[in-house]
Amino acid sequence: SCFASLLTPQGKFLYEFMVVKHKSGYLIDCEKTQVDGLFKQLSIYKLRSKVEILDLSNEFVVAVLSRNKFLSLKNTQDIEGNTIKFREDTLFLDPRNKKLGARLVINLEKLYLSIKKLNLKPAEPKKYYSLSHKLGIPQIECKHLKDKIFGIECNFEELNGIDFKKGCYVGQENTARIKLKNKLSKRLFPINIIKGELKEGEIIYHNENEIGKVLIEKDYPFALIKYRDKNFIKNTDFNT
């Protein structure tokens, strides 16, 4: 299983998702709010290819297991993307960061039985999303990144989402140029609110110097930060 994305011809972010082998085809695991847009985008790329693209979001769900639970099962390896079959369904260690645990992509009708077989206990989703935020991996409201940020600025290289040895793909020219010429000066970072509120698009300052912009404001906020700017200092407070 792998982490992947769709970019604009300019290399800007469109959609991110995980690709999982399932029987004679593949399943795409993405944020629920992005299903319709991603489905339409993939249908455009289909052209005359003998490929059938289906929206199965009402039939399949994703359950998240801890990394330790995954490694307690037979034939597992502590490697991002490591994939096994569990009762005919796909179970894989998150390809972005193994600290996020494993994902079970399963038909909704079989979910309860699999939870019972795995002896899983329910956990607060907030704990999972808080961990993801801490690790710098946005999973909610990613639509606010669309066309606003380069894929490489989303830390896709660190999240195993870019292969610089791969052949041509949409958005490759700018992505490769930024990488090879060491032009990456901004990155997506998680931010924590000390006081007040954030709004999408707000400029972030340090000592009256602009160093970034808020892109995701709700629940688990993220900002595009000029991390190479001389005014950017780690472990300090900023204001908007």
What are the residue ranges of the model-derived segments?
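Glycine-rich, small/acidic residue-mixed loop/short-helix segments
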Residues: 13, 152-162, 172, 176-240
